[in-house]
Amino acid sequence: MDRTFGHKAGLDNLETITTLCCKLGVKYLTVYAFSIENFNRPAYEVEALMGLVLSFFKMQLFHNNNVSFHVVGDVERLPQSVQDKLRSMEEETAMYDGMAMTIAMSYSSKQEIVNAAKIISRKVQNGEMSIDDIDEDTIEKNLWTNWMPDPDLLIRTGGEVRISNYLLWQCAYSEFYFCDTYWPDFSEEELHKAIISFQNRQRRFGKTEAQIEAEEKKK
């Protein structure tokens, strides 16, 4: 089967999962749609996917659910028509304060970090800051995702057990959930399984289990 059919099914399911996440009270949903490396795929597949992006997103989805739309990545690599579509959607949904739904398009986490390093280097070179001023917060402020919190949970579908150059900096303390189900078939039941798995974990952020339990008792 042509992979473009899979992309179409995946985008259709994205609408379903976005609606479900809204109902569950999720505040931030970020989806890896297209990596910079994906430009190396056959030209017909890339062109078809760009066409799907142009035709898929229905504004009603965002209007009905109070969802703001965002895009992160090296957007200037995308066709101008796709850039215009994505920026228009950001502008049209900017007033919504429910869930923030972000699409990673033309995204590479390594490139994102390199880009942040270049911005910071220029500031040092121009005398706007010194090397000693650089810390984790400095880097985070110059990432494409600087406006959103780090993810609590990363879900990887399709039986893959890698994160494929996605949010490498941001996922330092994220919980990972891997499943064999492919994204087009990722259902409400699968989403609930992922969330329940996350809820049953103890996030320690470098502390001991005893420390976390003591902190919980104080609440």
Feature map (PLM): residue ranges:
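Flexible, compositionally biased loop and terminal segments
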Residues: 1-219
